[in-house]
Amino acid sequence: GITPDGTREVLDYALYPTETAANYEEMMESIKKRGVKQVLLFASDGLAGMRDAVKRQFPEAEHQQCWVHLSRTVARYIRNKDRKEVLGDLKSVYRASYEDEAGKALAEFLSKYGKRYPKLAGIFERVKESLYSFYKFPEAIRKSIYTTNMIERSNKGLKHKSKVKEQFPNEDSLDRFVCCYFVPILSGCNVASVKPPPKYYNCLKKNFKPPINKM
């Protein structure tokens, strides 16, 4: 999550043998029990069932499909010689200034490449409800929320640290290791700020229902 002062905060973590939407839904239930009443936006990769899980637990929340993961999915269906051009054109969609411009850019993208790569249309159709949620938020923070990069940076660091340790004797050992890794993030040490300019706070506050007076 992001605190009012703009720093990242780990709201929860859990150990599971596999990654599923049901696991994440359990974590959503956990943060609700600990007092979280509203969430404005969830961003996730292409894991099946995530949008439905979000809507069951936080019906008012928006769900954003990560555009980086979406681009990687597209790349898998593109021939190497075309990949640079195709992915370059795809950037015009999520870098558009307005949602309607993004929609037009995607239509043009599919018109240009759809016949050559017929599976592209299905990729976007499956996540169409989560493509442009980030446009509902101030422009100053959109680059921070149209991907899952914030949590991916943490995950990458955790993966790197865990490789140094050859094995964990039990689940408690792994749990302690993960917890110790997240402590600096929770304390705000060495964490990049994503704080929007003050003028955008009023816009963000109005997104809550009922609107909040203080952040």
PLM regions: where:
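RNase H-like nuclease fold core
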Residues: 1-43, 48, 52, 57-60, ...
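Mobile genetic element proteins and their domesticated derivatives, centered on retroelements
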Residues: 8, 42-45, 54, 69, ...
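Conserved beta-strand -> loop -> alpha-helix junction used to position metal-binding or nucleic-acid-contacting
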Residues: 41-48, 53-91
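Acidic/histidine-rich catalytic cores and adjacent linkers
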Residues: 92-215
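A generic hydrophobic-helix recognition signal that picks specific residues
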Residues: 38, 62, 142-146
